[in-house]
UniProtKB/Swiss-Prot annotation:
Coiled coil: none annotated. The gene is xisA. GO terms for molecular function: DNA binding; endonuclease activity. Keywords: DNA excision, DNA recombination, Heterocyst. InterPro entries: DNA_brk_join_enz, Integrase-like_cat_sf, Integrase_catalytic. Essential for DNA excision. Site specific recombinase necessary for the excision of the 11 kb nifD element during heterocyst differentiation. Disulfide bonds: none annotated. This is Excisase A.
Length: 472
């Protein structure tokens, strides 16, 4: 996907360190994208100053300015047809919009156009034509959604640093915009909103709006999608208990027994990788993608890894972190540090093109396929929710649990508090009552001990008095 034209944009991002964590929320992702857009805008404005210095040095009576994501030519010109000559000079200062985007390529185009306009002014041959009246720009605006989708990647990475994470985000935006819009429709706000309105499912509509919003920002299409910005209520989930998780992992061995003999020799042992993946999701509460993006296998198997942490790579959704296990004994019970399984992981990843996010996504989707294959009653992400709920029940502070899962405290509480099932709530309440009962017992025993201590103190005082009396 990269070429020389794109290189200069990525070079402009060389001194930018993107926010290491988006906190897992849409707001966090938006702030990260905004940081990168502002960084690129600063670079463009710096280069714009240089362009205007060159134009001034060449005594060109034209300057370039930025306005709302576009570049305009500013010059004093003959009165435009239909305009009033308020000063009586026959001339007036105008800002000409030629549909030039405010990016590095646009600066080059704008500078060339400024020199061309300057020559017309100097020769006194300027005339108001379709180009300078903005009519050609209007024609250019009449592009279809399909036309813009073809240029989406090129334009998107003019304002975003290219990383594994941003490639994945772009794939998300592109695929949903392509899926939910008609490529033959003109790329207008009205048509894009109509596309969203035709989506029946609430979550699909919400996700489509997020993607189309990014599409519109990229192509400077004015659109109001605020009515679709509220996250829908979550559907109910089947969050597994610890007992169900322990039972679930045995279903992979059950599959081995029941699958039959007609199995391709190359994949006959592949179930072991997905059993291992199941175990890692359960123990660490990982996002499925965090297993497959640049896994630090050497660290996982290292003797120095005494805390048995899994290192999540910086290219993942919320940056790098070390995830700690809950139920550390499951690591041995599930045989998660067996080099054989890690070798299978490395082999599976090596067969994929890391720059092709459809292929990485295919790996994570394969987990869901195996969950259905072995007839588990829950989904991969439910193991992450189970980790969060288990942490809460065990009394782990919200901040520590949120950090371990790689998101903010706000996301943690908003996301996971709602998943407490009746059984989970009963367990949490019973454990709290048990702790309270234990406290009451200790308090009663302490009160009894205080009474006994007071009785013994008085007994000692009495004995002292008797001894003193006998010796007198």
């Amino acid at each position: 996907m990269q070429n020389q034209g794109q290189d200069k944009y990525q070079q402009a991002f060389a001194d930018l360190e993107p926010l290491s964590s988006t906190d897992g929320s849409f707001l966090g992702s938006s702030l990260q994208a905004q940081q990168q857009r502002e960084h690129m805008r600063t670079k463009v404005l710096q280069d714009l100053d240089k362009v205007n210095l060159r134009l001034k040095s060449a005594k060109t009576k034209v300057s370039v300015r930025e306005s709302n994501g576009s570049l305009q030519l500013r010059a004093t010109l003959p009165i435009k047809p239909g305009d009033k000559d308020t000063n009586g000079t026959g001339r007036k200062q105008y800002n000409l919009s030629l549909n030039i985007p405010a990016n590095l390529d646009g600066l080059k185009t704008a500078e060339e156009e400024a020199y061309e306009l300057g020559k017309l002014i100097a020769r006194k041959t300027f005339e108001w034509n379709d180009k300078y009246l903005g009519k050609e720009a209007t024609k250019k605006d009449s592009q279809t959604i399909g036309d813009l989708l073809e240029k989406f990647a090129e334009e998107y990475f003019k304002t975003h640093k290219r990383t594994t994470k941003s490639e994945h985000t772009f794939f998300y935006y592109f695929s949903r915009t392509q899926r939910y819009t008609n490529s033959k429709d003109l790329a207008t706000a009205e048509n894009l909103i109509n596309s969203i309105e035709q989506i029946d499912k609430e979550w699909a509509r919400y996700n489509a709006a997020r993607a189309i919003s990014a599409f519109c920002i990229t192509f400077n299409i004015e659109i109001d999608l605020s009515q679709y910005s509220k996250m829908p209520d979550r559907n109910s989930r089947n969050i597994p208990t610890d007992a169900e998780i322990l039972s679930g992992i045995t279903k992979f061995e059950d599959y081995l027994v029941t699958r039959g003999n007609q199995v391709n020799e190359d994949v006959k042992d592949s179930w072991q990788l997905w059993r291992w993946t199941y175990g890692m999701l359960a123990v660490f509460g990982l996002r499925p993608r965090e297993i497959f993006i640049n896994p630090n296998i050497d660290w996982w198997l290292s003797k120095e890894n005494i805390d048995l942490t899994w290192k999540v790579d910086k290219e993942c959704k919320t940056g790098e972190r070390q995830a700690l296990p809950l139920h550390k004994e499951w690591i041995d019970e599930f045989d998660l540090r067996n080099p054989k399984y890690l070798e299978m992981l490395a082999t599976a990843i090596s067969k994929k093109d890391k720059t092709n996010h459809a292929e990485i996504t295919a790996l994570t989707q394969r987990i869901s396929w195996w969950f259905r294959k072995v007839e588990l009653d829950f989904k991969p992400y439910d193991l992450r929710h189970a980790w969060a709920i288990r942490a809460h029940i065990l009394g782990i502070p919200i901040k520590a649990a949120a950090d371990n899962l790689g998101h903010s405290m706000q996301v943690h509480t908003q996301t996971y508090q709602r998943w407490f099932s009746l059984d989970m709530r009963k367990l949490a309440i019973n454990q709290a009552l048990t702790k309270r009962n234990e406290f009451e017992v200790i308090r009663e025993e302490n009160a009894k001990l205080q009474i006994e201590n007071e009785r013994l103190r008085m007994e000692i005082e009495k004995l002292k008095m008797e001894i003193a009396y006998k010796n007198s």
